């Protein structure tokens, strides 16, 4: 049995495409570090690795097999959600706001109640690290607003045409679904082949996400990363939701 590597500053991650799980007893765990070092997130995401851990743990770096992904044009927009989107678009008090107050979206995700889990993995360190990515143009947020009040949203990471969905939340019925519908429509319009959802949940499956083999995911990821010079314009409004109507 191989040991899971403990990474220091500037130490490279093992490549999940060419390396077996270091410890068969903890499938998908590829590395551990004391903290998130500068540049680590960029290196990790480009290898299909992401951090997921709690406050009382070291940083755990994962690349699960299978990998949950959403093909953007396979987003399941039910008849009831379509009705919600029509009302949302028609109501002048409602809006989609992109890339404003990124850390507020992260904090909302962290405090969101979820069945069977909590948001403790969105630690202060995680908020700081992803806010730094946002400031570099590598992370983005979508906020769902109702009369100026934040009622839902999500945040994601973007390298080239690779989109990694991180977390979402609702404070009002369908708040997170509206945000994901907007992100999915944006991806369809920009030729983004898939949204990484990382781990399987019943909620994501109900919205069209499905698991694929890690190898398939990583091969597709490399193709998307090769389009890193493509600059996406994250400047859209709720009118993007018309895609599903």
Which residues fall in each region the model found?
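N-acyltransferase acceptor-side catalytic subdomain
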Residues: 1-245
């Amino acid at each position: 049995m191989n040991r899971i590597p403990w990474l220091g500053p500037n130490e490279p991650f093992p490549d999940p495409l060419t390396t077996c799980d270091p410890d068969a007893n903890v499938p998908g765990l590829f590395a551990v570090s004391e903290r998130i070092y500068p540049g680590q997130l960029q290196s990790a995401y480009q290898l299909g690795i992401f951090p997921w851990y709690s406050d009382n743990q070291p940083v755990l770096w994962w690349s699960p097999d299978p990998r949950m992904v959403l093909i953007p044009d396979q987003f399941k927009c039910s008849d009831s959600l379509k009705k919600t989107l029509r009302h949302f678009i028609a109501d002048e008090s409602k809006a989609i706001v992109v890339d404003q107050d990124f850390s507020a979206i992260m904090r909302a995700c962290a405090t969101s109640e979820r069945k069977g889990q909590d948001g403790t993995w969105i630690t202060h360190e995680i908020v700081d690290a992803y806010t730094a990515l946002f400031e570099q143009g590598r992370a983005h947020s979508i906020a769902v607003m109702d009369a100026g009040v934040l009622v839902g949203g999500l945040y994601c990471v973007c390298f080239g045409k690779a989109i990694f969905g991180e977390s979402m939340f609702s404070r009002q019925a369908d708040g997170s679904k509206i945000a994901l519908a907007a992100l999915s429509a944006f991806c369809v319009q920009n030729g983004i082949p898939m949204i990484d959802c990382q781990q399987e949940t019943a909620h994501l499956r109900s919205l069209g996400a499905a698991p694929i083999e890690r190898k398939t995911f990583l091969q597709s990821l490399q193709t998307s990363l090769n389009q890193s010079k493509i600059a996406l314009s994250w400047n859209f409004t709720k009118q993007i939701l018309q895609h599903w109507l």
